[in-house]
Design a protein with these regions (language model features):
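Bacterial N-terminal signal peptides
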Residues: 9-16
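N-terminal Sec signal peptide cleavage junction
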Residues: 18-20
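Bacterial N-terminal signal peptides that target proteins for export
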Residues: 1-7
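Structured alpha/beta or helical-core interaction and ligand-binding surfaces enriched in interleaved
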Residues: 24-169
Length: 169
């Protein structure tokens, strides 16, 4: 569990500081001076079940994964006892309004919500010591959690079937 928190913390810090803006500009700049930069895998939402099957089978470095299309819409697919739930961490101030949107979404769909933190320091606001996390305790199989993730990305973040997401971590 501590490894999961540390990994999510480092990931959130990296995404919050640099943004998961899907432009590739930073990587291109570093590559132009001879620094090799690994690129995150990119998918559309229809490929998410395959990624989650790999997570569930233990074929990934961590027992969770996330998708991030524009730096604000990052959701994490967490695993517990073979079932998945979704976390959202508000690392930047532009993510804060989505906490209430996700709570409302969870209420409308009768998903239990847990408010927590990974003890990560927000990147551009100081009124909270740690970045808040909303955990939607869906406890679903892969097909069901993909539907929930797709609903969140489309209704809350206004993404669509063609949105390209980076897989994180």
């Amino acid at each position: 569990m501590n490894t999961k928190i540390l990994a999510l913390g480092l990931l959130s810090l990296a995404l919050g500081a640099s943004g998961c803006r899907n432009t590739g500009k930073q990587a291109t700049q570093l590559q132009s001076v001879g620094i090799a930069v690994p690129r995150a895998a990119r998918i559309t939402i229809d490929k998410l079940p395959e990624i989650l099957r790999n997570v569930q089978a233990g074929r990934t470095q961590f027992d969770f994964t996330g998708i991030c299309g524009n730096g604000t819409d990052c959701i994490y697919f967490m695993q517990e006892n073979g079932k998945f739930y979704i976390d959202f961490e508000a690392m930047s101030k532009e993510q804060l309004p989505y906490l209430d949107s996700l709570k409302q979404f969870a209420k409308e769909h009768n998903y239990p919500v847990v408010e927590t933190t990974y003890n990560n320091t927000p990147v551009d606001y100081e009124h909270l010591k740690y970045a808040p996390v909303i955990s939607l305790k869906v406890h679903a199989d892969i097909d069901s959690i993909v539907k929930v993730g797709k609903q969140i990305e489309q209704t809350i973040f206004r993404n669509n079937e063609r949105t390209v997401y980076e897989i994180v971590p």
